[in-house]
Amino acid sequence: MGGMITTTTPYIEGKKIIKYLGFVHGVASVYVTVKYYEDVKDAYERALRESEDTALIRMVDNAKKLGANAIIGINSNYAMVGEKGDMIMVGIYGTAVVVEEDG
């Protein structure tokens, strides 16, 4: 993540939060395409990983724009969209902060 600390917890062990920069998020959606050599389950898992990775990268990019070096309290939402449920949408969000070594 290019030096960005990311965590689902509201704090980071050994770090002191010196500034809260606010809410950041990343959203991504990917169509599920089943390749002739894979089964449907594998296709959905691949699409989910792709959309999670993209959403996380977008969230980190948004935090960097604010001057953050960490994101705390990360959470995510998932949805199947499209007429046939053939698209996975992922939203990842958290709080951008600036941290320094505690002590």
Swiss-Prot record:
Pfam families: YbjQ_1. Gene3D superfamilies: Hypothetical protein apc22750. Chain B. InterPro entries: UPF0145_dom_sf, UPF0145_YbjQ-like. It comes from the Archaea. Belongs to the UPF0145 family. This is UPF0145 protein MJ1413.
